[in-house]
Amino acid sequence: KHKLSFYSSIQHTDRNSYYGAQQDANAYGKTKDLTWVAGGMYVGNFEKVLFSPATFTAGLEYQNNSLHDIMTGYHRDMEQDVRIASAFVQNEWKMNVLTMLVGARLDKHNLIDKLIFSPRVNLLYKPADDFQARLTYSTGFRAPQAYDEDLHVAAVGGEAMEVRLAEGLKPERSNSFSGSVDWSFNFGHFQSNLLIEGFYTALNDVFYLESLGKDPVSGTLVQERRNGNGARVYGANIDYKIAHGKEAQLQLGFTVQRSRYTEAVRWSEDEDVAAIKRMPRTPDYYGYFTFSSAPLKNFDFSLSGVYTGRMIVPHFAGYIEKDRLEHTPDFMDFNLKLNYTFVLNDHLKLQVNGGVQNIFNAFQKDLDKGMNRDSKYFYGPTQPRTYFIGIKFFN
C-alpha cells in the first residue's frame, strides 16, 4: 500500500501594540508577520526491507516567515526573513516482538551556514499485549533568530526592557534519550495502565538572557540573548490510569526533573546578585490528576488538578529596591466542570455546562503594583478563581 499526500498553510498577523512605561506616548509599535508552509509526504508499506516487513516514510517541507517589527520610540525597525528547507526520511521495521524505527531530518536554515542533521532512533519491545518497553534517541535545534516573545517589551521600574540577539549567536542543539515501560492490567471490573519513564536531554550552546543595562541611544533596558556553555535536563515521570467503564476514570501523573546550566549564568547587571546554575521558572516537581464520571445518562462531571512545584524567578528592581532571585511557593490548582445534556430531538442535543477554575484560588500573592512594577514578574497559575457557564449544541 502506498500513500502520497500534500499540505500547505498560511497565516498573516498585522498587530498594533503598546509596550510603554509611565504613559510613554512614543511606545506604540506595529508588527507584520507572514508565515506559510508547504510540503509533501510519501508513505509506503513493504513486505520486506532487508530483514522484515517495514513502513517507509519520506517527505519534503518548506517554511517561510517574513517579519517586520517597528517601534519608533525605541529606535527599533527589525526585518527578519526566515527560510527553512527540510527533507526527512524514516523506516520502521516490524518484527515479532520488536519494532525498530530509524530516521533523520535534514534542514537548511538561511540564518545558519551549515546543514542541520537530526537523526532519531526508536526501539519498541513488546513481548505481550499488556507490556511494552521503549528506548528513544532524538536530536533537535533552535535557530539563532528572533522569536515572538522577543518582540514584547517589558516594563521594569518604570522603564522599558527589550530583548536583543547577540552578535554571532549560534543555534542551540539538543540530544535527548528516554526509556519507558508500559504495563496494562485488569482486576475485577477495573482496567488500569502504568507508565514509568526516564529522560535525559543535553543542550549545547543553550540560549539564556543576560542584562546589559541601558541602551545609550533608545534609553531602554536591554537583555541580550546569548549562548551559554550548555545545560542538562533530566528526570523521571510516572503516569497511572484506572477506569471502571464510563462510570469513573482516574488519570494521574508526577514528574521529578532537574534543569541545570553546566556553568552559572548571570541574569542581572547588579554584581551583588549571584549567577545561577538552576534554570529559572522550571520546577523540580510537577504533576496532575483528572477524575471524570458519568453517574447518570445525561449528566457527567470532571475534577482535575495541576501541581506546580517551587521555582526560582528573576525579579527586577523598580517596585522592589534591588534585583533579586525569588523562591516561589508551590501551587495546587483544582478545577471542576459539570455537564448536563438535553435531547431536543433525534438529531440535536443541547449541553449546559458550568464550573469553577482554580477552586481554592491558588494564585501569586506578591504581584508588583504601580507604574514601577516588573511586568515579567509572574509565576504559577495564570488566573485566579474563576466561575464559568456555557452551552453547546451538537448532534
Give the predicted meaning of each segment.
Residues K32-W36, E79-A85, L115-F117, R173-F177, ...:
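Residues that define the transmembrane beta-barrel architecture of outer-membrane proteins
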Residues L135, N175, L250-V256, K277-N395:
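Conserved C-terminal beta-signal and adjacent last beta-strands/turns
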